[in-house]
């Protein structure tokens, strides 16, 4: 009786793998255990078929008297007919055991690990030895070599340049210069606007030394102030003449003491506030601060603002409320 391969079910099995629990022929054994390093470490036992001269059959493992006919996979024992019926008819669990007929084929006493051939011997598939020591099965037919894939070129194509300019463009058409990139992403702006520090930003420039502090413009002396007042009598403005050099942002300064009184002219008709410096000789003394409401009563016809060098915050009068509601001040 012969045992067929559990994989192809055509050829006669030559080895038994304990990890796969399957009988394999020579060709299937090479395909299964040559797949990876883990499969190559499986222990295999060669199948020893009985010879024609030796017809003695093994004895039962239970009674040790009669010839064994069956092999129980769960009990891992060979049983005779009587022992098999008494053991597997005991309950429902033993009835489900898998039993096989004995063919007289024995396993080798020693196991072997699959040893892949070297590179030199792999070139000639006809010289490969797939046999297991102690097996009488001849070498299987050689396997066909798989077709190799065509080699792929890893060359990088050089960048192409535009004939009409100096900007280099790659094969997908994207620009490589920073100026063209900024012109595409920020339309209306040029690279010179970001790089040229001499251009003023939004009409403001930095004057004087590069110390980050704006210059403070002092008023001129009394003689220069009188001379300027004589030239500007029609305008009634006491302004400070600023030098042409190192011209920066001029911030009006608040005097130490408030003027004693304000003139009758506070606001101009166009409601523009004029800034200047306070002069003791030309400006009257102010004792108390007059609110905005008194200013409106003093000059109704021709209102003009006379700058004394300080800031005056106008008071906002809330709209009149209805008669049934009380007036509430928010200030």
UniProtKB/Swiss-Prot annotation:
Alphabetized SUPFAM superfamilies for the sequence: B-box zinc-binding domain
Q: Per UniProt, what does mutating residue 20 to A do?
A: Abolishes interaction with HY5
**What's a GO cellular component annotated to this UniProt protein?**
nucleus
Low complexity: which segments have biased composition? 115-126, 228-238
Subcellular location(s): the record lists: Nucleus
What UniProt keywords are attached to this protein's entry?
A: Activator, Metal-binding, Nucleus, Repeat, Transcription, Transcription regulation, Zinc, Zinc-finger
Which InterPro entries does the entry link to? B-box_zinc_finger, CONSTANS-like_Bbox1, Znf_B-box
Where is Zn(2+) 1 annotated to bind? Answer: 5, 8, 28, 34
Q: Which GO terms describe its molecular function?
A: DNA-binding transcription factor activity; transcription cis-regulatory region binding; zinc ion binding
Deleted gene: phenotype: Enhanced number of emerged lateral roots.
Which Gene3D superfamilies does the entry link to?
Classic Zinc Finger
Q: Where is the region Disordered?
A: 115-167, 209-241
Major location (coarse): nucleus
Amino-acid positions noted as binding Zn(2+) 2 in the UniProt annotation, renumbered to this chain: 60, 63, 83, 93
Q: Origin, by domain of life?
A: Eukaryota
UniProt-listed GO biological process terms: photoprotection; positive regulation of photosynthesis; regulation of DNA-templated transcription; shade avoidance
Q: Where are the zinc fingers (B box-type)?
A: 5-47, 60-102
Pfam annotation, one family: zf-B_box
PANTHER family named in the record: B-BOX ZINC FINGER PROTEIN 21, B-BOX ZINC FINGER PROTEIN 22
Its job: Transcription activator that acts as a positive regulator of seedling photomorphogenesis. Acts downstream of COP1 and play an important role in early and long-term adjustment of the shade avoidance syndrome (SAS) responses in natural environments.
- Assembly behavior: Interacts with COP1, HY5 and BBX32. Interacts with FLZ1.
- Name of this chain's protein: B-box zinc finger protein 21
**Species this chain originates from:** Arabidopsis thaliana (Mouse-ear cress)
Q: What is the lineage of its organism?
A: Eukaryota, Viridiplantae, Streptophyta, Embryophyta, Tracheophyta
In the UniProt record, the gene name given for this protein reads: BBX21
